């Protein structure tokens, strides 16, 4: 499992109709970008949230965004950092980190995972 605290740095229109891209700056120099549809867009810029990536279904409420899918990509960038991608059945989550989710042995390629972004109480 991986979790942390983030601040939403931007919410931008995506390439497809009714799609937004939420960008977050998180603990430990982690950056996360994820797609969300207009109907599910429940977040605001500068909002503080927590994220969870887990093989087990986490607890969440109707105020949170939670979906499941597969970790399908990890690639190392020229600067040595990693990009991991999770497909939530079409919606994409990109995790930019120093060590990578697979490289650091937290997850394996094609693991079924839950991705949740939870509002602070």
Curated annotation (Swiss-Prot):
Any Gene Ontology CC annotation: cytoplasm
Role of this protein: DNA-dependent RNA polymerase (RNAP) catalyzes the transcription of DNA into RNA using the four ribonucleoside triphosphates as substrates.
Protein's gene: rpo8
Known partners and oligomeric status: Part of the 13-subunit RNA polymerase complex.
Chemical reaction(s) catalysed: RNA(n) + a ribonucleoside 5'-triphosphate = RNA(n+1) + diphosphate
Region forming the signal peptide: none
Designated name of the protein: DNA-directed RNA polymerase subunit Rpo8
GO molecular function: DNA-directed RNA polymerase activity
This protein's UniProt keywords: Cytoplasm, DNA-directed RNA polymerase, Nucleotidyltransferase, Phosphoprotein, Transcription, Transferase
Species the sequence originates in: Sulfolobus acidocaldarius (strain ATCC 33909 / DSM 639 / JCM 8929 / NBRC 15157 / NCIMB 11770)
Source taxon at top rank: Archaea
Subcellular location(s) per record: Cytoplasm
Post-translational modification: This subunit is phosphorylated.
Main location class: cytoplasm
EC number per UniProt: 2.7.7.6
Pfam families in UniProt: RNA_pol_RpbG
Catalytic EC class: transferase
A biological process from GO: DNA-templated transcription
Family: Belongs to the archaeal Rpo8 RNA polymerase subunit family.
